[in-house]
From Swiss-Prot:
This is UPF0060 membrane protein PCC8801_1733. It comes from Rippkaea orientalis (strain PCC 8801 / RF-1) (Cyanothece sp. (strain PCC 8801)). SUPFAM superfamilies: Multidrug resistance efflux transporter EmrE. The chain crosses the membrane at residues 7-27, 36-56, 58-78, 87-107. Belongs to the UPF0060 family. It is found in: Cell inner membrane.
Length: 109
């Protein structure tokens, strides 16, 4: 699988996981309508399917996705909850993304 397609899968996986979780959070914690929860649960179901479209093995895909999840979570918090990441958040994210990239995209036999 090419890197661009793989990154797209990670992007949409992140949207489904964080967006779905956020909608369920709004329903449970902020009293939003059950419609929020239903949409959230649907997105979380897609989150369970999308990683399986990657060609790498389960452990590698989920390990690398962990890095993507970190950046998506920080960006979501910044743009949706209006809590900007600080310099340590960015440094930690950079370190994690380097590791995730090595896990997912290092040339192997």
């Amino acid at each position: 699988m090419n890197i661009f397609r793989s990154l797209l899968y990670f992007f949409f996986t992140g949207l489904c996981e964080i967006g779905g979780g956020y909608l369920v959070w709004l329903w449970l914690k902020e009293g939003k309508s059950i419609k929020y929860a239903l949409l959230g649960w649907g997105l979380l179901m897609l989150y369970g399917v999308l990683p399986a479209l990657q060609t790498a093995n389960f452990g590698r895909v989920y390990s690398a996705y962990g890095g993507a999840f970190v950046i998506f979570s920080l960006l979501w918090g910044w743009k949706v909850d209006r809590i900007p990441p600080d310099s340590y958040d960015w440094l930690g994210t950079l370190i994690i993304l380097i590791g995730a990239s090595v896990i997912m995209y290092a040339p192997r036999n």
